[in-house]
Structures are given as structure tokens and as C-alpha cells.
């Protein structure tokens, strides 16, 4: 999904490039190769910017299938750091912690400035875990899985601190309503439910 930053639309392409398009003229202002194909066959060489670009301060974070997470400076269009985590899910953050659900279901807390992994939670591996939603006011994050579980984790440690069950099957997406723990959950059966962390 394209994202607007000031007067530029930033969009990722299947080629693995991230471009900045002038909002008024439609001309490309800049283009940066984020992911490069590798491997000996067409499947192994698949790269794509799959998650929505995520903006935090002067950085834009991009993630892709069979690739990595890249932090790019918006002002200079230079790469700040890369982390070898593959994901197609949306990213989140709380303060200076980037929140990532890897393709295998592991959840990572990554320092937004350095790219250093602060913690890893492996207890939800292979459970079809959703992208994380950060809840800044509570210093927590929430994810869902294919069985309809909502799981709350501590942003500082990655420790699981709460769990609840949805009646509607697998969690597809979690949408923020506020920074204080109110959110919507879309389930695979089409149900949309409102939640609040107490």
C-alpha cells in the first residue's frame, strides 16, 4: 500500500525497489533498490516488498518475502540498517522498538536506530500469527493467531502477559483505535470485533 510522506508518495514494487513519487506531478523523485533477487531458480529468486511501508520519524521500514527488513532514511534515501528477518505482515512500533512478526510466527523487538534485536518470542511459531499492533500507552503489543487467540506481550521483554479467545476463527488483521489499548479485530469469518485492554 502506498504511503504519503509530506509531498511524496512512497511505494514498494515487486522488483524489490522503493520509490518516492511526487504527489503533484507524478514524477519519480527517487528510487532505492531494497531487495535483490538471489538463488539458482525462479522460486528462490522471488523478492517483493510485501508489508506496507512503516514510517517512524525520519525512517521508513520495509519488509519483504524471502528477504529482510530494511530501515531507510527518508531525507537521504540511504539504508540505515538491515535485519535478516523475512515477513509479509504489517510492522508496528512502540517508542523506539520496531515490532515484527516473522513468516514462521516468531515475534521480534528491534531497536529502530541500530537494527539490533532486543528480544525474540518463539512461543507462537507456526500458528499463523498476525502482524503486531503496538499499544504505546501500555507499553504492550497484541497479535492474533490462526486459532483465534489474541495474545498480549510486553514490549520491553517480549514476554506473553495476557491471552483471550475470539469466537470467529483465525485473526486476519488488528486495527488500532487509540494508543491506550482500544482496537478492532478482523476474523476469517468476516466478523469485526472491538476490544480494550483493561
Model-derived regions, located:
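Extracytoplasmic beta-rich repeat domains
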Residues: 1-6, 31-55, 78-95, 118-136, ...
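Short loop/turn segments that connect beta-strands within beta-propeller blades
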Residues: 23-26, 73-76, 111-114, 154-158, ...
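Structural signature of WD-repeat beta-propellers
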Residues: 6, 13-14, 57, 64-65, ...
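WD40 beta-propeller blade core
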Residues: 19, 70, 108-109, 151, ...
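Blade-level signature of beta-propeller repeat domains, shared across WD40, Kelch, NHL, RCC1
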Residues: 166-198
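Loop/turn-rich, solvent-exposed surfaces of beta-rich toroidal or solenoidal domains
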Residues: 100-112, 116-152
Amino acid at each position: 500500500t502506498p504511503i504519503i510522506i509530506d509531498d511524496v508518495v512512497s511505494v514498494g514494487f515487486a522488483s524489490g525497489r522503493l520509490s518516492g513519487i511526487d504527489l503533484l506531478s507524478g514524477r519519480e523523485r527517487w528510487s532505492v533498490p531494497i531487495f535483490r533477487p538471489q538463488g539458482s531458480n525462479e522460486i528462490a529468486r522471488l523478492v517483493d516488498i510485501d508489508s506496507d511501508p512503516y514510517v517512524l520519524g525520519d525512517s521508513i521500514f520495509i519488509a519483504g518475502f524471502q528477504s529482510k527488513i530494511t530501515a531507510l532514511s527518508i531525507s537521504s534515501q540511504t539504508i540505515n540498517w538491515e535485519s535478516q528477518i523475512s515477513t509479509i505482515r504489517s510492522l508496528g512500533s512502540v517508542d523506539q522498538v520496531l515490532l515484527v512478526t516473522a513468516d514462521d510466527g516468531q515475534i521480534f523487538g528491534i531497536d529502530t536506530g541500530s537494527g539490533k534485536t532486543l528480544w525474540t518470542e518463539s512461543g507462537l511459531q507456526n500458528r499463523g500469527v498476525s502482524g503486531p499492533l503496538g499499544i504505546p500507552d501500555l507499553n504492550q503489543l497484541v497479535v492474533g493467531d490462526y486459532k483465534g487467540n489474541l495474545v498480549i506481550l510486553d514490549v520491553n521483554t517480549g514476554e506473553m502477559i495476557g491471552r483471550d479467545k475470539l469466537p470467529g476463527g483465525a485473526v486476519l488483521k488488528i486495527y488500532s483505535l487509540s494508543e491506550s489499548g482500544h482496537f478492532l479485530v478482523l476474523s476469517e469469518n468476516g466478523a469485526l470485533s472491538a476490544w480494550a485492554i483493561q
